[in-house]
From Swiss-Prot:
Keyword hit for Cytoplasm: yes
Organism for this UniProt entry: Vibrio cholerae serotype O1 (strain ATCC 39315 / El Tor Inaba N16961)
Family membership noted in the UniProt record: Belongs to the GroES chaperonin family.
Pfam families xrefs: Cpn10
Alphabetized InterPro entries for the sequence: Chaperonin_GroES, Chaperonin_GroES_sf, Chaprnonin_Cpn10_CS, GroES-like_sf
Complex formation: Heptamer of 7 subunits arranged in a ring. Interacts with the chaperonin GroEL.
Protein name: Co-chaperonin GroES 2
SUPFAM superfamilies to which the protein is assigned, alphabetical: GroES-like (SSF50129)
Main location: cytoplasm
PROSITE patterns: CHAPERONINS_CPN10 (PS00681)
Keywords, ordered alphabetically: Chaperone, Cytoplasm
């Protein structure tokens, strides 16, 4: 991959949602909501602070996250694959 996030940004690969309902019915692609879970594939160096240091990033490459899929999330295709670019503040939780 040839994309590198800056500051407090993350590059995330969206994880697929299961296409079956709780009752076992197979759902069409129009019926399936986009997943708000993803795998972090790249992490920026952290937000620059006034004193010249950088804020420590809590999210690491390889983490599985739950994120807020809202206004600030950008989608970018790299080498034919779709990635999300989001801020660390858009991360709601790390799945352990």
């Amino acid at each position: 991959m040839n994309i590198r996030p800056l500051h407090d940004k993350l590059i995330v690969e969206r994880l697929e949602v299961e296409n079956k309902s709780e009752g076992g019915i197979v759902l069409t692609s129009q019926s399936v909501k986009k997943s708000n879970r993803g795998k972090v594939v790249a992490v920026g160096l952290g937000r620059p602070l006034k004193n010249g240091d950088r804020a420590r990033m809590e999210v690491k490459t390889g983490d599985q996250i739950i994120f807020n899929d809202g206004y600030g999330v950008k989608t970018e295709k790299v080498d034919g694959k779709e990635y999300l670019i989001l801020s660390e503040s858009d991360v709601l939780a790390i799945v352990e």
